[in-house]
């Protein structure tokens, strides 16, 4: 009986630990997402790129990122009205109101740097 109680208590403690880690990861993602949104609103491409992880940076140079941000992304929308939609598979989704309506997707890598930073047309 003592072994069963010990096993149950151990499982509960481990489960609580995983829960707290998941909450901490979500809190970090939410915090960095707020910073990303701030930099979008301020049109600070260099600051956005500084938040990027190694994989992200290996796909896009800083100069190319700045060019895309300044010539395509920033003129597209003012990013002033952004609403959280959901989190799925550690990716936060946001609706960006305006013309056109956009969807913003943000995720982090293992070092809490941007892994996914995607802006696409919003579809219901």
PLM features per residue range, with description:
Residues 16-38:
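Short, low-complexity N-terminal intrinsically disordered segments enriched in polar/charged residues
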Residues 118-124:
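Short, solvent-exposed aromatic-acidic interface loops
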Residues 40, 45-86:
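Short solvent-exposed beta->alpha transition segments
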Residues 68-111, 116:
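Surface-exposed, charged secondary-structure patches
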Residues 4, 15, 99, 109-111, ...:
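Generic structural motif
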Residues 1-22:
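Bacterial Sec-dependent N-terminal signal peptides
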Residues 17-23, 55-57, 102-104, 117:
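Short charge-dense sequence patches
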